[in-house]
């Protein structure tokens, strides 16, 4: 999938902190940063009420805004790859991290909440990631 840094975000302060950390690390290492948002999760009525097209559009807008905000905060950016994917967050993050050097997650946001299968997304990623996992406090 990629040979750089993968960061999972979902629009919270912890996700923004993880993105900023990943972007700084990407600039230090000279590596691309893949910013991943799992859309279409059954976490609330607002998501269930959206069509797939609306959910993907909202996810893409959120990704663009998060990267722009992090770029301002960090003062630059490495090569950025944005991925908005439909499905279970842990599964998506683990797939994206297959060839990654690092997987970066924020603590205190949805990645720490119980996923559809009843397990913490961050715990699932720590247990099964093919690369080191960095958990950034939010």
Describe these PLM feature segments:
Residues 51-62:
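A short acidic, glycine-rich active-site loop
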Residues 84-92:
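Charged docking surfaces used in two-component/phosphorelay signaling
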Residues 34-36, 81-85, 134-136:
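General small-molecule cofactor/ligand-binding pocket signal
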Residues 102-128:
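Glycine-rich, Arg-bearing micro-motifs that act as flexible, cationic patches
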Residues 70-77:
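Short helix-capping segments at alpha-helix termini
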Residues 2-49:
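Small/aliphatic-rich secondary-structure junction motif
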Residues 4, 101-102:
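Structural motif
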Residues 37, 106-108, 137-138:
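Short secondary-structure boundary segments
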């Amino acid at each position: 999938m990629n040979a750089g840094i993968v960061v999972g975000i979902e629009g919270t302060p912890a996700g923004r902190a993880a993105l900023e950390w990943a972007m700084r690390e990407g600039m230090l290492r000279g590596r691309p940063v893949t910013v991943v948002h799992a859309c279409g999760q059954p976490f609330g009525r607002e998501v269930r009420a959206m069509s797939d097209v609306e959910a993907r559009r909202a996810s893409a807008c959120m990704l663009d805004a998060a990267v722009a905000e992090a770029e301002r905060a960090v003062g630059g950016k490495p090569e950025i790859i944005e991925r908005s994917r439909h499905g279970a967050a842990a599964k998506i993050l683990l797939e994206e991290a297959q060839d990654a050097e690092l997987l970066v997650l924020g603590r205190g946001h949805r990645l720490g909440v119980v996923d559809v299968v009843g397990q913490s997304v961050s715990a699932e990623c720590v247990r099964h990631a093919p690369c080191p996992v960095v958990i950034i406090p939010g």
